[in-house]
């Protein structure tokens, strides 16, 4: 199995971010680590081995990213809530504006162009996976979210600002009109929650 490690500077997060890529071709799947996890956890917990045949056959290509959960969702002590919510949105922009273009470029090296990126994760990783698909169904075409929690109240309690709202699928989907263009896009996505 082809495995590549990347460490690249993120202007959005003002730090180096790490990720690993497993496979040479196939549907790109963006893997979010579970709560407070790291990019290597999916492999270390045996999850890469469970789909090794799909990777080796070129059916899927995994992109295991890092999280900043300790500064956002899980950080309830040191940082003020406004800083935490700001970093939620910075992480969103890191994924969408910086990592997704890299995923597209790396995946295209096999000579084909994916028709969308899937997301997956467990625990808080599932929450990220679902949030990114629901926020950007124009980029993400499927999601497998295992044991996620899709509201911000568990981590932010009663606090809600624009950033928290935009990262809480329960809140923004409930507030979405039935004729919003994303509703039709959701119907075309493969979603497992």
Protein language model regions, located:
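Non-catalytic cap/lid and distal C-terminal segments of serine-dependent acyl enzymes
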Residues: 1-193
